[in-house]
Amino acid sequence: MELTEALVAEDITPFERERLREALEEEVSRQLPADRQLLRVVDWDPRGGHAVEDAPGKRKYTVAYETEPRD
């Protein structure tokens, strides 16, 4: 399992679990090196979901995820 930080649209609240998971999966996938693919987002820290000063309209989350090598 690995950890990263991800920014998602501020209009996605911590209570919209499926929508939030999809947004986190998209963001984490963009951050991965070309030789890795995302298996799943395991968990995220909702307390990290505050507005970010240098990214207006975004919330920052700490995300735990699993990857595997691309074929």
Question: Where are each of the predicted segments found?
Answer:
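N-terminal cationic amphipathic segment used for targeting or macromolecule association
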Residues: 4-7, 21, 49, 53, ...
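A structural detector for beta-sheet-dominated domains
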Residues: 4, 42, 64-66
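C-terminal edge-of-domain segments
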Residues: 51-71
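Acidic, low-complexity, intrinsically disordered interaction modules
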Residues: 27-57
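N-terminal acidic leader/helix
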Residues: 1-33
